[in-house]
A protein has these predicted regions:
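Non-catalytic, solvent-exposed interaction/assembly segments
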Residues: 1-123
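Gly/Thr-rich phosphate-binding beta-strand-loop-beta motif of the actin/hexokinase/Hsp70
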Residues: 126-151
Length: 152
């Protein structure tokens, strides 16, 4: 999961020289790659690369490398994880953040000078963390619940 401080840090990210890739992708544990999931991702990547307007050569190279890295990550996570994946990448600026979300999100891929965090904000608004206390004779238990699970 992630916390509000990480979200604030991503929200403040802005770089006039480098482009950042914001990718949200739904995962289904054990989904075979041949089922079209990777084809959908490849179509998103091709669309993002085709939409370049004022990118420099170095920006294009950086974005291409970041998108290739995201593609490899998604291919691995499709087999291992379920829920959703949020990735923020700008390798020339040293940004590589991966968040595993307990619910599906996306698919969405945006290349811009800022991060696209609206889906994560909506996720936090929809699935808030809450606390439950069980009190018994001489004993109490505190549980923190969020979409990622229960913590005692």
């Amino acid at each position: 999961m992630f916390d509000f401080e990480e979200l604030r840090e991503l929200a403040r990210y802005r770089d006039e020289r480098n482009l950042v890739c914001s990718c949200y992708y739904p995962l289904e544990k054990g989904e075979p790659a041949g089922e079209g999931a990777l084809i959908r991702l490849k179509n998103l990547i091709n669309g993002a690369l085709a939409d370049r307007e004022d990118w420099t050569g170095s920006q294009y190279k950086s974005v291409s490398e970041d998108l290739a890295r995201i593609e490899i990550l998604v291919a691995e996570e499709l087999v291992l994880s379920s829920g959703g994946l949020a990735v923020f990448a700008a390798s020339t600026a040293g940004l590589w953040k991966v968040f595993h979300l307990p619910v599906k999100c996306g698919p969405m891929l945006v290349v811009d000078r800022t991060t696209r965090i609206r889906p994560m904000i909506e996720f936090l608004d929809r699935y808030r963390r809450y606390c439950t206390v069980l009190v018994g004779k001489g004993k109490a238990r505190i549980f923190l619940l969020d979409p990622g699970g229960v913590e005692e």
